[in-house]
Amino acid sequence: MTPVLAADGLTFRYDPAAPLLEDWSVEVGAGEVVAVTGPSGRGKSTLLYLLGLMLAPRAGRVLLDGQDVTTLPDARRARLRAHRFGFVFQDAALDPTCTVLDNVLETALYRGDDRATATRRAAELMAEFGVALRAHARPGQVSGGQAQRIALARALLGEPDVVLADEPTGNLDPESATVVLDALHRQAGRGAAVLVVTHDPRVVARCDREVVL
């Protein structure tokens, strides 16, 4: 079966003399939750940016449903990100000028989703993740753990085919971390490919397999 997402021989470097990733490959199938681990500075976050079409590799390919999407025009890559991918960044990456609710809705509205329907779904996810009462607050008024759960709600709002999560439980207590991991597994159960960058062995234990950088 063709994997949902694959990297084929990815090479990337910020410093020409020091490759961060060198001829690196992975496949993630529908329904899989894969942990990406390794020492700090090995390029785990960069790998997610490459797989999420936010960076272009120096060499190699990113494949979505078996199709090479590495060299698509920027506008096409942006549409794929909005329609097929969900991202949870390590620092949550919330817009401080918008309310929490508008941050959750941002990608859905970019896709052209109906606002009322998206708002109802956002409210359900925010309640599930324990941040419903913060809907009209600004990101600067919520804790780091709450911001991470808000970012997860944004990532899952569109039922993405691929979820890329960078330390999604890093700021969370064990109970909240379980809620987040359960949500990622439910998305995988719907057929998504899920990659989770983590240093937490408890998170690795909940994943289907581990890939070490």
Each PLM stretch: what is its role?
Residues 138-142, 146-148:
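Conserved ABC ATPase signature
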Residues 60-68:
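Conserved ABC transporter NBD signature motif
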Residues 163-166:
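Catalytic Walker B motif of ABC-type/P-loop ATPase nucleotide-binding domains
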Residues 97-106:
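Short coil-to-helix segment of the ABC ATPase nucleotide-binding domain corresponding to the Q-loop/switch region
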Residues 82, 137, 158, 183, ...:
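Conserved signature/switch motifs of ABC ATPase nucleotide-binding domains
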Residues 52:
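Helix-to-loop junction immediately C-terminal to a conserved catalytic motif
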Residues 69-85, 189:
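ABC ATPase NBD coupling module
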